[in-house]
């Protein structure tokens, strides 16, 4: 969640690059090529610029600028001998404006590289087979439906449903990647980016029997889940 008590506008930048093509937008189901200017857009389904697509799964209100920007390199650096000449370029900017003093604000989007606007429009309804399972302060999780691959970032202990009647719990912060077949887990990878934990303990729905150099499983037939300590 995005929170601030400051009387300053809070923004999340999606991208800011040189403008290299026309900007096409799907807004409330209507597709249009935008003229050069700055604007706020509501009910945006997707945006396309320079072979890159940006999908907004729930539709979103975003700010978009595709116009000339001017500035000096000397204004953004403390280095000496930097030219104070005014530079002018056409720039593409896409961002979320959360406003002043946002409370529990959030955002989500999908970036699709090397795609045409036509291809993006044809596949955006399915979000390119990507499902956002969770997007909270506790954890974030996405699943590629076609490849049956889940990725989860736990910021603290939490639980997420990764398939119908299949949940995964972690007792601490950590990250997990899960390859699935249907509702069954085929491969589970776990990491501790903080490198501070002595162990990570996971509980998954279903009964599994496996053992490795740094993990083992404890099936619980009564609860129909499996306890997986790792170190």
Predicted regions and their residues:
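Terminal accessory/anchoring regions of large secretory-pathway or extracellular enzymes
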Residues: 1-231
């Amino acid at each position: 969640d995005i929170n601030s008590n400051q009387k300053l506008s809070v923004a999340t930048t999606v991208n800011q690059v040189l403008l290299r093509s026309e900007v096409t937008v799907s807004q409330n189901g209507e597709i249009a090529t935008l003229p050069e200017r700055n604007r706020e857009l509501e009910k945006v389904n997707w945006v396309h610029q320079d072979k890159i697509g940006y999908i907004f799964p729930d539709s979103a209100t975003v700010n978009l600028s595709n116009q000339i920007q001017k500035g000096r390199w000397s204004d953004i650096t403390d280095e000496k001998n930097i030219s104070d000449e005014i530079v002018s370029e056409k720039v593409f900017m896409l961002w979320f404006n959360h406003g002043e003093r946002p409370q529990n604000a959030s955002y989500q989007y999908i970036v699709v590289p090397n795609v045409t606007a036509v291809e993006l429009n044809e596949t955006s309804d399915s979000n390119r087979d990507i499902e956002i399972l969770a997007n909270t302060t506790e954890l974030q999780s996405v699943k590629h439906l076609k490849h049956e691959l889940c990725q989860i970032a736990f910021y603290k202990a939490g639980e997420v449903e990764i398939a119908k009647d299949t949940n995964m719990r972690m007792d601490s912060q950590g990250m997990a990647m899960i390859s699935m077949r249907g509702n069954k887990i085929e491969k589970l990878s776990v990491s501790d980016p903080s490198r501070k934990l002595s162990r990570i303990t996971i509980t998954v729905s279903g009964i599994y029997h496996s053992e490795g150099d740094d993990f083992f499983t404890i099936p619980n037939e009564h609860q129909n889940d499996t306890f997986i300590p790792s170190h």
